[in-house]
Amino acid sequence: MENRSQFGTRAGFIMAAVGSAIGLGNIWRFPAVAYENGGGAFFIPYLFALLTAGIPLLILEFTIGHKYRGSAPLSYFRMNRKLEWLGWWQVAIAFVISTYYSVIIAWAMSYSVFSFNLGWGDDTEGFLFGKYLNLSAEAGQTGSIVPGVFIPLVIVWAVALGILFRGVKKGIEVANKIFIPALVIIFLIIVIRAVTLPGAMEGLDAFFKPDFSKIADPSVWVAAYGQIFFSLSIAFAIMITYSSYLPKKSDITNNAFITGFGNSSFELLAGIGVFAALGFMAQSQGLSVQDVVSGGVGLAFVVFPQIINSFPALNGLFGFLFFASLVLAGLTSLISITETYVAAVSEKFGISRKKAVLFGGGLSAIVSILFATQNGLRFLDVADYFINQFGVAFVGLIEVIVVVWFLRKLNPLQAHANEISDIRLGAWWKVCLGVITPVVLGFMMFGLFKINLLKQFDTENGNYEGYPDMFINLSGWAVAAFALVLGFLFTVKRWSSKTEADTTYKEVS
């Protein structure tokens, strides 16, 4: 009889998977990416990327986790004993991401409090970088811990680890059943209010107006695949880990389609809310929408506070709802990211879940303090860029090449998925994973290595954001390399006797 933890309901798994996929990037990255790559026309390559890469990869990872019944390292180990390193590489990437992702949630938590009295004032940019983050003058200087970031960071980790302490069914599932509906309701309120503001229609027109000439640009297709890839929590152990908690008779392909389209639906909702608000801001300042469009940290913590300042009424409430939505979206993702190494450490060393949460989550929480210092924003910016581009995207390419091309595991994985799923996998799935996905990811990685190694960014020194070489090497390349090296180091340690004994695994019937 299987002793592995399980989700209590199918809805619980879907909420958890969607909660992992829906994160900060849905709100602050997707709208700007869509606008810059053809507006309404971008949805053509975006949908194509979802159907030919996003959902096929979700199905692949759901099937691996469900078939081999383990964390990413254990699942790959059971697939092929020489493949354990790939799982640990993904887990190491997840660990790095959790250390700085938690800090962004802490910022959002602080700003939800600032919303009540519009504490950021009129100069929202000066407040963020000066008064709140107390950003140091030079890259590379750590500086002191910023109390306004550190205190909410402690709260974020207390909530996340407290949920993980309670386990899969009573912790992760229950939390996502509360957080995801709350997130959707809150964001619907934001969108409804935003589209009724003066200038909202101009913002939506800018967002949806198609520029079909962009479709002929290969970079637009790469942007679409990149958005899908980074948005769905693919290739850093999450979906493999979560699907290993599914009951034996679970519809894998259906769950993948629901997760993929659920995530994309929220991205579209976020785009509507963001651009309606940007349209209002543009009109109130006498500017065009193009002049106020931004993404990332600037959109969330500089532009949106400016928008909230201009609201005709209920500024504080709208601000609180917006930043509360960031907190909820961030927490559901942080929980899933942390679960990857909690599960892996527990299985590898044969320790209890609670000890794994204390060890893995506690270590991540300690490391995250680095990003709560005066130079934390710069450390975060570089680490995030390099671990995503040369961690997540690169390991995704390697995952597909190894599993599909070298080990030729698609046939047994297809048979497993088809046995328990309503939507049967056919030749389309093999073509997507065997040809389309590796070609697009390969092209994307070639471009990324080229622009970074040859220093082709439009900055004074050619580096990403113009950072000094030493800072790029230590906070960027070294972090990405650390994840890969850690992946190989963890394979040296034998699995716990309990896990080793079970590694003549029972195929899921």
Feature-to-residue mapping (PLM):
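Membrane-embedded translocation segments of transport machinery
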Residues: 2-7, 11, 173, 177-336, ...
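Membrane-interface "cap" regions at the ends of multi-pass membrane proteins
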Residues: 1-28, 57-62, 66-78, 85, ...
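Extracellular loop-to-transmembrane helix junctions
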Residues: 5, 34-60, 86, 148, ...
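Transmembrane helix-boundary motif of multi-pass solute transporters/channels
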Residues: 10-49, 202, 238-246, 255-257, ...
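Inter-helical loop and helix-membrane interface segments of multi-pass membrane transporters/permeases
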Residues: 2-5, 33-37, 72-85, 89, ...
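Hydrophobic alpha-helical segments and their helix-loop junctions in multi-pass secondary transporters
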Residues: 57, 101-126, 184-208, 278-280, ...
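Transmembrane helix-loop junctions in multi-pass membrane proteins
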Residues: 24-33, 40, 160-171, 192-204, ...
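C-terminal membrane-solvent junction of multi-pass transporters and transport-like membrane proteins
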Residues: 349, 353-361, 387-475, 505-509
